[in-house]
Amino acid sequence: MTPVLPLTDFATIMVLSPHLDDSVLSCGALIADAHHLGVDVVVVTVFNGRPVPPVSAPASRFHARCGHTDDNAMDEREIEDAHALGVVGARTERLYLPEALYRKDQDGKPLYDSDLAIFMETLRLSDDELRAVECRIAECVDDVDPDLVLAPLGIGGHVDHLLVSVAAQRLDRDVLYYEDVPYVLYERCKNWRDGMAGHAPRVHVCTAEGWSAKVSGIECHRSQHSVLWYSPDTWREDLDSYARASGGGRQAERFWSRHDR
């Protein structure tokens, strides 16, 4: 029988969110249900730094797809995130590191010069990037002192998700890893569980209120929907189907340990 994650065992849960929407997308129901039970939930957004002009061509294309300009993109996304986290009942910490499309080398050239370059299933993570992320996350964890840390598994291979996932593995804390939405829904990621062979998930069976809060929280990130979903008109149904498959017919979110076999 798949073990259930007992939320009342924790006074404070920290959710490491690579970007401003990842926490609500991947574990918004757990956040809402934990908050309802009196648990202090802190969402730490790692990559929400402003781009330094000139903005790369891939970053400008991304902004345009989301309906933003190069100047207002992060401000608009933070407003959406504040609304989303208010819906699910989390407080927020932000580390203001630049996300992949904004990062540059010492000569001012983009580190990732195409949309596909940020997906690194086979490429080696940069030591400098990892060191910066690891240091900032460790400092925040020490300040908040959570009983449990939730971090991304890195499904989909987005370099920012992988950096946060690897940094979390180096924490001297109890860490569980969430399934990265929307990537876990993508056909190209269907074999992600091959990398978790021998590991058993913990399951959070969502309350109706928790699931509703998750969906409402995701809706707050309206500018991102055109880039998140293969089928923007059916994402609610697609997410519901996946959640019910994860929970044996009941809506559920799953969390994995990298240590128990």
Language-model segments: which ranges?
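Active-site beta-strand->loop->alpha-helix modules in alpha/beta enzyme cores, enriched
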Residues: 1-167
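C-terminal accessory domains and tails appended to enzymatic cores
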Residues: 2-8, 88-89, 107-145, 173, ...
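Hydrophobic alpha-helical membrane context
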Residues: 31-33, 172, 191-192, 232
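Residues that form or immediately flank small-molecule/cofactor binding pockets and catalytic motifs
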Residues: 48, 97-99, 183, 209, ...
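Short acidic, gly/pro-rich beta-turn/loop elements at beta-sheet edges
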Residues: 53-54, 188, 215
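Acidic, Ser/Thr-rich peripheral helices and adjacent loops at domain boundaries
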Residues: 61-67, 193-202
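Short, flexible loop segments at boundaries between secondary-structure elements
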Residues: 174-195
